[in-house]
């Protein structure tokens, strides 16, 4: 609890542990941690969660549709492609991109769709990607935690996603990574 209050203040959020909103947020974070989220290694996801809970953040884009195709080819090659449709303000963007794997294809397609609106995304790099199985007794139906570390110039941040579907967990962490960078850019302009 004290760590959470400290972090919230570090993010310039006015959190009081006796306030009803703050108590609700603390309960929600504990529930997420029970589901497998781990915010100690993903402070960017925690910061976004707190800003959203206090009504100080709205997503910069809305996912309308995402389709991922992985094709195993005759020559042992594997091709991954993501087709994405997002909405930014009132404008819908529909695009596709390939990648070294399905998560890389999703990352490439998302940035391709958003870079026109948010050029700062050209500088963003995913520098690390880690997957951890949360309950090994469930085999391929086990929930996984995905941690993504991203960089942009001298800045570095980490985000997290959890799901029984590795693509969904990766999507959650990827979206947080993009939104975090865009939030930081917006805060720079406001300050």
Regions found by a protein language model. Give the residues of each.
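Terminal or standalone catalytic/regulatory effector modules within metabolic enzymes
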Residues: 1-191
